[in-house]
């Protein structure tokens, strides 16, 4: 079975991502996405945006509320199969290229999702959509995305928050514990691939 799981790191929330583009050129580990990981069940690949190392302002509603030292990818444990980008535009282009390949080949993509008002909120996907729109990239590549409700996982404590593979680990745990939503999603994906 062919499918891809995706995890986005370094993004605080969708609102802050919007503020990043509204306020200008500031780079801040808690404001913009800086790493995305792709996992196909065997290999983990990542694309990292190389952030400046000096302190950067933290914005809230357009006002500087503090400063932070930005992450540099060398300071963080990353997968071996890693592409390092010089800026967010280059990062976006590479992430888009991966997603387009998955869409063209009908390979399902799994993101984490969170329940909000009885609907699943695709937090990471929404951040990517904001970034893609900023750089005039076709957001239809995100149409292949499916979601896993991570909040309903009874074994959530086994997932290390902020790790590169927390969503992939969730999928593994879900299968291991025969979680119905995970098992049914995998079954549906398998059937859809057979039909291609």
Label every model-predicted segment.
Residues 14-16, 131, 188:
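Active-site-proximal flexible loops/turns
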Residues 1, 63-66, 194-196:
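Short intrinsically disordered terminal tails
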Residues 22-26, 80-86, 168-172:
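Surface-exposed cleft-lining segments at the edges of enzyme active sites
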Residues 44-153:
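Conserved DEDDh/DEDDy metal-dependent 3′-5′ exonuclease domain
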Residues 1-38:
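Entry/capping segment at the start of metal-dependent catalytic domains
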Residues 110-113, 119-122, 151-196:
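Acidic, Mg2+-coordinating catalytic module of metal-dependent nucleases/exonucleases
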Residues 7-9, 124, 181:
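Acidic active-site catalytic centers that drive phospho-/nucleotidyl reactions
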């Amino acid at each position: 079975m062919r499918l891809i799981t995706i995890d986005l790191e370094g993004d605080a929330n969708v609102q802050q991502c919007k503020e990043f583009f509204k306020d200008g050129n500031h780079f801040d580990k808690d404001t913009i996405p800086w790493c995305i990981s792709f996992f196909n069940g065997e290999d983990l690949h990542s694309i990292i945006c190389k952030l400046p190392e000096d302190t950067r302002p933290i914005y809230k509603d357009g006002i500087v509320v503090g400063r932070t030292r930005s992450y540099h990818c060398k300071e963080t444990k990353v997968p071996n199969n890693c592409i390092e980008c010089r800026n967010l535009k280059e990062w976006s282009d590479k992430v888009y290229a991966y997603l387009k390949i998955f869409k063209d080949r009908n390979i399902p993509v799994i993101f984490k999702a969170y329940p909000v008002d009885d609907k699943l909120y695709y937090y990471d996907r929404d951040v990517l959509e904001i970034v893609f729109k900023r750089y005039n990239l076709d957001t239809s590549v995100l149409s292949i995305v499916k979601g896993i409700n991570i909040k309903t996982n009874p074994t959530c404590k086994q997932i290390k928050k902020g790790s590169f593979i927390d969503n992939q680990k969730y999928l593994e745990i879900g299968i291991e514990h025969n979680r119905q939503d995970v098992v049914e999603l995998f079954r549906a994906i398998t059937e859809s691939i057979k039909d291609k």
